[in-house]
Amino acid sequence: MSRAVRDVQNSDFMGRYAEGHPNEGSQVNRYYQGTAKIDAVERTAREEIKRLFRCRQADVRPISGNAANTAIALGYLRGGDPIIVNSTDAGGHISHNTIGTFGRRIQSRGKALTSGKTNSIPLHYFPLTEDRYHTDVAKSIDLIERVSPRMIILGRSLFLFPEPVRELSGVCRDRGIPVL
């Protein structure tokens, strides 16, 4: 392995998360902080790609769970469609949060959606048991019946215990609610 590759592997870029878009001044756009150097590299790369391809927009972030969730959000959901997800406090993916794909980043027909507005995606979070480590299945079923979501999204960035797929998918199937 070359010294250059080792240097990159030993750098801050190998282990630091930089989800979201670069912070701009006092505007915080990242879920994790301490990303000033990554922000600078990403901004430079974005500007270089725009210049190279003579385009107005470019996204240089690596393909990830965010990209997959964006495809679902843009292809399946419309403003006002409620969804039920795991909160980031419960290990849920950042894209399931108000600052992620299903929160403020989703667009509908070219119009940016703003969290809490009529054209946003109303986010509901799976209730947790008292220990805050497990999904409360009974309360989740109640939430599904009450909210009648367009879809539910299981899965997390942090898995400590299995998700209640079997328990919730049956309820959703009976109501025609897709489970992702």
Where are these regions (language model features)?
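Conserved N-terminal alpha-helix of the aminotransferase class I/II PLP-enzyme fold
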Residues: 13, 18-67, 122
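Conserved PLP-anchoring active-site segment centered on the Schiff-base-forming lysine
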Residues: 77-93
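Short acidic, glycine/serine/threonine-rich loops at helix termini
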Residues: 70-74, 94-100, 136, 163-167
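Catalytic PLP-binding core of fold-type I/II PLP enzymes
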Residues: 160-180
